[in-house]
């Protein structure tokens, strides 16, 4: 007698529910997506105990035909695809025909629905079995209530998290729906407390304001890019506003919120050197493409997708964000808040950005955008100072020739303000005046940005600038590191450092790039070797980038080093020539502005 048997529909649905319905948030996602597929312009969500006790989704979509209502709860019954060809041109959020059957098998469900000019009906199901059907009066649309989720699967029930955690997961789902469908009025309430409410205006920025608040999204940039295959719209909250998680990056492909590591990384690469370490941006990335280029039939929950031209899309996202941010004047402004009642309390300061209009990035501009050449900077007028400390001779200042003194202020590129050097504060910050107010420049961060951009270019062309050493350097390698030297040697060779074995645990360096600091060659080589040994399976581009950042940090002016006016002037001239003068490679601000108006407010000259 054989031992293989066909499973009952009830058991098969429960097994399917294990993949489709993981938690209350899964139910909310599936039912809200069904409402959107039904053409709803308003969706209401009501929750009790974070959906574990009750979930009600109400919409004004086209509703079910009476004869389709029961069939909708049969596994793999759907109106969204008809044959295998439709599977490769999916334009709806749902298509598998599994969600309702899976949800009904692990809960108690009540469906109320009415189609235009049809009779309204109500169905009641218990563990997927129909227990009641009746006619009702209602407006066009659908209301679906799910109660006692997982009551018949105790194993799944015990793995649910706390009410707070489950509610956070639901809120995250609803936030992404709001961003993906800003033209739909979305209202969600949990035991009397509103979770989200959008106005359905069609403006993603309004949805962002509803979720994160108007103050957070001030200065949001909108950037667009196109190729033959993709249309891209990026909503980028100013780089100063960051979060501790990548979860605030929302990817929307053809109206579907998805998770994709490569696309998320492309967003972060676009913000490169503008974000502090461990911080992430708030961004909504919308992509429209031919359905043939995307496979959403990867997982029953439809969270993951496959893209046939993923690398091209990643490049488009990265370049669109990078070029958009590079065109902005991202100088934080210091604005005082209202003073506290305690007169001795110090006034708090907030930062904000001034965002300029963003031009659309066409396919040509994304791939062939010429980096504008900055105008040569002249010298600023230097007011006399009563006390100028002598410079520290150990400071490694740029080697560029110093232009002659003139009475003109610093002439810079279109993004960087014209500045007059006033002096130095605490031997760490350069104080400047400009047309709009007063500026403070972090001298270490400023030179770090200058050197980073220089080193990055130099590392990209090591073979063009190499020199033989008259006295080669010898380095001893720890036994633990010797095992990785076969991986490290190609990286060092690609940045211009030629190492040869010189004993069981020694290597000799005979060639180095000509631009290495002549008095710090040995130290620089050791630092680059250490940087390579610290990495695990790193590619050449990443190594060059990390090495440029490391060297820029270690070779730049430190805090508490006095500079004379000529050094400060030259530092600002060189900073103005960089591609992104407003942050150091680690994402910290280089320059901060106090506007004239805010200074007058601090001195109570204006109200």
Swiss-Prot record:
Any GO CC annotation of this UniProt entry: mismatch repair complex
Keyword DNA damage part of the UniProt annotation: yes
Stretches with biased composition (Acidic residues): 397-407
InterPro entries: DNA_mismatch_repair_CS, DNA_mismatch_repair_MutL, DNA_mismatch_S5_2-like, HATPase_C_sf, MutL/Mlh/PMS, MutL/Mlh/Pms-like, MutL_C, MutL_C_dimsub
Alphabetically ordered keywords of this record: DNA damage, DNA repair
Superkingdom of the organism of origin: Bacteria
GO biological process, one term: mismatch repair
Segments for region (Disordered): 374-411
CDD domains found in the cross-reference section: HATPase_MutL-MLH-PMS-like, MutL_Trans
Short name of any one Pfam family annotated for the protein: HATPase_c_3
Molecular function GO labels: ATP binding; ATP hydrolysis activity; ATP-dependent DNA damage sensor activity; mismatched DNA binding
Positions of transmembrane segments: none
Chain's role: This protein is involved in the repair of mismatches in DNA. It is required for dam-dependent methyl-directed DNA mismatch repair. May act as a 'molecular matchmaker', a protein that promotes the formation of a stable complex between two or more DNA-binding proteins in an ATP-dependent manner without itself being part of a final effector complex.
Similarity annotation: Belongs to the DNA mismatch repair MutL/HexB family.
Entry protein name: DNA mismatch repair protein MutL
Organism encoding this protein: Exiguobacterium sibiricum (strain DSM 17290 / CCUG 55495 / CIP 109462 / JCM 13490 / 255-15)
Gene from which this protein is expressed: mutL
């Amino acid at each position: 007698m054989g031992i293989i048997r066909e499973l009952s529909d009830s058991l098969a649905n429960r097994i399917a529910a294990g993949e489709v319905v993981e938690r209350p948030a899964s139910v909310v996602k599936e039912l809200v997506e069904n409402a959107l597929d039904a053409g709803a312009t308003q969706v209401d969500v009501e929750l009790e105990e974070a959906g574990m006790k009750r979930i009600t989704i109400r919409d004004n979509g086209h509703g079910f035909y009476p004869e389709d209502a029961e069939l909708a709860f049969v596994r793999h019954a759907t109106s969204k695809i008809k044959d295998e060809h439709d599977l490769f041109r999916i334009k709806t959020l749902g298509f598998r025909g599994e969600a309702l059957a899976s949800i009904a098998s692990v809960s108690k469900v009540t469906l109320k629905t009415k189609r235009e000019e049809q009779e309204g009906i109500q169905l009641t199901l218990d563990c997927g079995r129909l227990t009641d059907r009746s006619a009702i009066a209602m407006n066009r649309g659908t209301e679906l209530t799910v109660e006692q989720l997982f009551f018949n699967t105790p194993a799944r029930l015990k793995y649910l998290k706390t009410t707070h955690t489950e509610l956070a997961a639901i809120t995250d789902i609803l936030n992404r729906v709001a961003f993906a469908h800003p033209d739909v009025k979305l209202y969600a309430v949990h035991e009397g407390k509103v979770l989200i409410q959008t106005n359905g205006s069609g403006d993603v920025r309004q949805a962002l304001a509803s979720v994160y608040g108007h103050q957070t999204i001030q200065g949001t940039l909108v950037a667009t890019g196109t190729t033959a295959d993709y249309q891209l719209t990026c909503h980028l909250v100013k780089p100063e506003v960051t979060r501790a998680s990548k979860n605030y990056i929302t990817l929307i492909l053809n109206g579907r919120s998805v998770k994709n590591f490569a696309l998320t990384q492309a967003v972060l690469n676009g913000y490169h050197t503008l974000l502090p370490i461990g911080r992430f941006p708030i961004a909504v990335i919308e992509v429209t493409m031919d359905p043939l280029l995307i496979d959403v039939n990867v997982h029953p929950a439809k969270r993951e997708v496959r893209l046939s031209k993923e690398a091209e899309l990643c490049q488009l996202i990265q370049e669109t964000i990078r070029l958009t941010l590079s065109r902005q004047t991202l100088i934080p402004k210091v604005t005082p808040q209202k003073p506290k009642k305690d007169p001795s309390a110090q006034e708090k300061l907030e930062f904000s950005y001034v965002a300029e209009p963003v031009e659309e990035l066409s396919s040509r501009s994304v791939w062939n955008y010429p980096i504008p050449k900055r105008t040569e900077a002249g010298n600023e007028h230097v007011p006399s100072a009563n006390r100028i400390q002598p410079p520290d001779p150990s400071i490694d200042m740029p080697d560029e020739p110093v232009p002659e003194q003139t009475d003109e202020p610093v002439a810079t590129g279109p993004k960087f303000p014209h500045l007059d050097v006033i002096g130095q504060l605490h031997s760490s910050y350069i104080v400047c005046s400009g047309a709009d107010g007063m500026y403070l420049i972090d001298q270490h961060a400023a030179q770090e940005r200058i050197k980073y951009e220089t080193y990055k270019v130099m590392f990209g062309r090591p073979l063009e600038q190499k020199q033989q050493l008259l006295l080669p350097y010898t380095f001893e390698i720890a036994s633990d590191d010797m095992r990785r030297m076969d991986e490290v040697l190609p990286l060092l060779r690609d940045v211009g450092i030629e190492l040869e074995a010189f004993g069981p645990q020694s290597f000799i360096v005979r060639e180095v790039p000509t631009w290495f600091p002549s008095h710090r060659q040995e130290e620089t080589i050791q630092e680059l070797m250490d940087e390579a040994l610290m990495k695990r399976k790193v590619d050449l581009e990443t190594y060059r980038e990390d090495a440029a950042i490391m060297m820029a940090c270690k070779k730049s002016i430190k805090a508490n080093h006095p500079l004379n006016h000529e050094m400060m002037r030259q530092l600002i001239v060189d900073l103005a020539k960089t591609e992104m003068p407003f942050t150091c490679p680690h994402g910290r601000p280089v320059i901060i502005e106090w506007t004239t108006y805010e200074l007058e407010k601090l001195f109570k000259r204006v109200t």
